């Protein structure tokens, strides 16, 4: 997709101006389109330079950014390309005082909260920025009458939780055995977890790198066969009555749970899956220690997040292999590994 030229900075200096999304030079319009299409069913290029998100919400671009534009609009130094959001404004009024500091996007529009299609578009673009290392520029006057423009740059590492969608159901005892090398002991009781000792943590780290060798092809084949047999027996009768949750801990601040349920509802990105329209088994990995609000994580929290992230990735790989699953992150984007 060709650039539409240099972004006209003068169009974005006044209150009420359109919002912008900006990305580093290595991000291509095709990557942006792929994520847009995964979020919205009616998304796609309408014409050169016009990418529909949903309904009347569109992105115009890409535009080039030079140093003078970055300085004029106070954009991050890495910004090289930009898209303008064209969307009919839909607002509900000021953000309630007790809700401030909870959500990055809501705080940015505290003076007049977006709702409906505008909120959906902004939320989706913020998720795309998190995935691609970009930023959302919110125009002046959005958080307060005389407030300057704001730059929202979500931390790519903040996307921790994963879900695996599979045609096959794995029972509690089998999943505990499958995931023990990477998640440790999993319990039905959220209050019964013991903090792992230093030696236990060392053993778990070693197990992560040796998980395939430890389980072996025969064990994985057995779990796959059991899941397939259960699915054949149950057919399309999987319901939330089969749901269960398991709890575990990887250390201080690194408590988590694995929720397993059946559902016909899947993210838009899976709408073309061969199993679409039938019940999926959903294996949800969620970090319980995630801090609330927009504050910066301290060192202990960052270490805990890193532990959980690595363990979740290993667990999701195992589940995807054992149950022929598809991994989706908390922003509803596909996750793949080389």
PLM feature spans:
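Acidic (Asp/Glu-rich) sequence patches and key acidic residues
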Residues: 1-338
């Amino acid at each position: 997709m060709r650039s539409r030229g240099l972004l006209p900075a003068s169009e974005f200096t006044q209150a009420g101006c359109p919002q912008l999304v900006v990305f580093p030079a290595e991000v291509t319009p095709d990557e942006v389109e792929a994520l847009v299409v995964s979020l919205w069913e009616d998304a796609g290029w309408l014409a050169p330079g016009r990418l529909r998100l949903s309904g009347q919400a569109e992105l115009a671009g890409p535009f080039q950014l030079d140093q003078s534009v970055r300085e004029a609009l106070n954009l991050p130094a890495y910004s090289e390309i930009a898209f303008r959001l064209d969307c009919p404004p839909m607002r509900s009024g000021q953000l309630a005082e007790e809700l401030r500091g909870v959500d990055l996007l809501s705080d940015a529009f505290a003076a007049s909260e977006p709702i409906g299609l505008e909120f959906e578009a902004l939320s989706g673009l913020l998720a795309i920025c998190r995935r691609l290392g970009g930023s959302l520029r919110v125009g002046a006057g959005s958080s307060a009458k005389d407030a300057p423009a704001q730059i929202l740059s979500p931390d790519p590492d903040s996307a921790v939780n994963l879900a695996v969608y599979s045609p096959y159901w794995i029972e509690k005892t089998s999943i505990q055995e499958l995931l023990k090398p990477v998640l440790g002991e999993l319990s039905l009781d959220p209050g019964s977890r013991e903090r792992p000792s230093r030696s236990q943590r060392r053993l778990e780290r070693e197990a992560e790198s040796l998980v395939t060798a430890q389980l072996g092809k025969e064990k994985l084949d057995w779990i796959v066969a059991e899941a397939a047999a259960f699915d054949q027996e149950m057919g399309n009768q999987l319901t939330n009555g089969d749901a269960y949750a398991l709890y575990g801990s990887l250390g201080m601040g690194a408590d988590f749970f694995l929720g397993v349920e059946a559902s016909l509802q899947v993210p838009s990105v899976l709408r073309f899956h061969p199993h679409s329209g039938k019940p999926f088994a959903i294996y949800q990995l969620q970090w319980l220690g995630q801090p609330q609000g927009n504050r910066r994580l301290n060192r202990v929290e960052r270490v805990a997040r890193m532990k959980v992230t690595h363990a979740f990735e290993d667990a999701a790989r195992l589940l995807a292999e054992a149950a022929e699953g598809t991994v989706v992150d908390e922003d509803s984007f596909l996750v793949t590994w080389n």
